[in-house]
Amino acid sequence: MRLILIRHAEPDYVRDSLTEKGWREAELLSERVSGWDVTEFFCSPLGRAKDTASKTLKKMNRTAVTADWLSEFSCQVKNPVTGQMTSPWEYIPSDWTSDPLMYDSEAWTNSEICSSNPEVGRKYRLICREMDRMLETYGYIRDKNIYRVRGKKEQYIIHTPAPDEPEKMEMLPEGNEPCIVIFAHFGVISSILSHLLNIPFVLLAHAAFFPASSVTVLSAEERWGNEAYF
């Protein structure tokens, strides 16, 4: 399976739409996406994500599943250093890195900062739960920190086959894997990646950056039994 996560183009947050530059980004993005063999599209219900997706969907004559759980985080927390209310990923490095819970992919929501607003944990868990439900419709069942592919013919490939290993090359997928494209937001994309890669949310959100109209591609590694890991 291939998962492609697209952040909305440059936003006009006041109108919940796109700036003039954002519309140009969305058009250029559509030229790239329209060349893909996409199984299904998903999109946040917020205007800036829907507007970004609209160019691609029109060009491909497709529709997207609008999913409320893909809406951006609306909850905020009080930054203990600045005293300001901020998104639950805008922290001072020397502050959040001093809390061991921030390095736990499950317990980070119990950290002193994040637990100050229980909605942060609830939103994160909602995204993770709904992501797993969507993957399950394609046969990918969460099993602790990996996925198991329902009905998949088991095979065991120790290393990536080289071109001079034809008998092993034949065992690789033939390219007909499902391809899912999701139009969403920074916090949502960070949450999905945190869950799939088993990386603490705050750590990932500070270590990686997903600019407007960015494209993040995950491909499931499926070479050992019925196991899959993104």
Task: List each model region and its residues.
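Internal catalytic-core helix/loop-beta-alpha segment
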Residues: 113-167
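Extreme N-terminal starter segment of soluble prokaryotic enzymes
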Residues: 1-4
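Phosphate-coordination/substrate-recognition cap region in phosphate-metabolizing enzymes
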Residues: 30-118
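Short N-terminal binding/cap micro-motifs at the start of the first secondary-structure element
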Residues: 12-17
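Active-site metal-binding loops of divalent metal-dependent hydrolases
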Residues: 9, 186
